[in-house]
Amino acid sequence: MSDTAEQRWSVYLIRNNRNALYCGVTNDVERRFNQHQSGKGAKALKGKGPLVLEWSCAFENKSMAMKAEYFIKQLTKTKKELLVQESAVIQVGEGQSFVFYSRK
């Protein structure tokens, strides 16, 4: 098995100083967050610190993590805030699609 196949991939949400949530995918959340903080990450976060890692969720492989990232990016800010507050979850549904569930 290759190193890539054994890695856990995660989706994460980072809050910037404008209260916006940035969504990304990585195989090492701590390393990637440190890159964002040092200005070596996404252009969307440069100069918008302090940054706060608000949420992350691990997936079984890179493909699923990237699908989850796309799904989360399509959510409204309100729904992303529910994920951060742990008042909602996303789950893999039929056909490897994602479903948003509120915990109310």
UniProtKB/Swiss-Prot annotation:
- Supply the InterPro entries for this chain: GIY-YIG_endonuc, GIY-YIG_endonuc_sf, UPF0213_domain
Q: What is the lineage of its organism?
A: Bacteria, Pseudomonadati, Pseudomonadota, Gammaproteobacteria, Vibrionales
What positions does the domain GIY-YIG occupy?
7-82
* Family the UniProt entry places it in: Belongs to the UPF0213 family.
SMART domains attached here?
GIYc
Please identify the protein, giving its name as recorded: UPF0213 protein VIBHAR_05350
CDD domains under this entry? GIY-YIG_UPF0213
**SUPFAM superfamilies xref list:** GIY-YIG endonuclease (SSF82771)
Can you tell which superkingdom this protein's organism belongs to?
Answer: Bacteria
Xref: PANTHER family: UPF0213 PROTEIN YHBQ
The residue stretches assigned to a coiled coil in this entry are none
Q: Which PROSITE patterns has this protein been placed in?
A: GIY_YIG
